[in-house]
Amino acid sequence: MKQSSPEGPKNYDSHSNESTADVATPKLAIEVTDLTVAYRERPVLWDVDLSVPSGLLLAIVGPNGAGKTTLIKAILGLIPPAAGQVLIYGRPYAEQRRLVGYVPQRGSVDWDFPTTVLDLVMMGRYGALGWGKRPGQREKELALSALAKVEMTAFVKRQISQLSGGQQQRVFLARALVQDAQIYFMDEPFQGVDAKTEHAIVGLLQELRSEGKTVVAVHHDLQTVPDYFDWVTLLNVRRIASGPVAEIFTDENLRLAYGGRVAFLTHKAHTRPDHSDPADPATHGKWGRIRP
């Protein structure tokens, strides 16, 4: 359905025309082929291909209305596609559901629901327990361990309605961790959190990567993409480009994704977060931010 152009953005996927016979190809965690999603006959995603190797951190980046959240929901089967195929480790998502964890946007959750932090995190184990089984001591221990990783142990008995935005996000991440998934989808995990929570989330993502897990996150802050992620997918209804940040996150590709609505920052103007590695060449260069 697509016609590749030799002058177009470089992409890394199983549909590329480039020869890879002599290159060891990493195992694909996610493979999306010709995915199209429409709302009331209006295309939100159009003919999207995406291949994600296992064991890396991938940012999905694009302007508002680009279809970023829709892409995640379509992969997870939460939105029916008009066309296309999704494979998780080479098999349909329905057969691999237990390998996947999901952290939706905080705004999509009823935080006034009367439940404690510990109970909310243990809900992440329901899929593994099976129908009709209640969580026991093992599930409680797993939940407490996950809460310790996000530094929320002191809040186990607190009602979720009493948490701050950053605390809510940490609890949501803990709920995903107890699923012990191989792939985690996160929809704007850094949105509305304080600097301490953002730092903690970055550390958690890096820990998941060190365990061989794959993380796909919708992300809006273009400045931090090179510091936080290994790969990036630029999306604007269609996939603009996808691959290693150092090769894909270029001025040209950003202009294609944002329609020229990007102000570019020079290296001197780029402020590096405290947890970044100044020796990493992937964090150097020009990066963009969206103009209001």
Regions found by a protein language model. Name each.
Residues V61-P63:
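The feature captures the beta-strand-to-loop junction immediately N-terminal to the Walker
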Residues G84-Q96:
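Conserved ABC transporter NBD signature motif
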Residues M122, Q137-F155:
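Conserved ABC ATPase "signature" region
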Residues Q159-L163, Q167:
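Conserved ABC ATPase signature
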Residues Y184-E188:
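Catalytic Walker B motif of ABC-type/P-loop ATPase nucleotide-binding domains
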Residues H219-H220:
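H-loop/switch region of ABC-family ATPase nucleotide-binding domains
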Residues W231-V245:
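H-loop (His-switch) and adjacent beta-strand-loop-beta switch element
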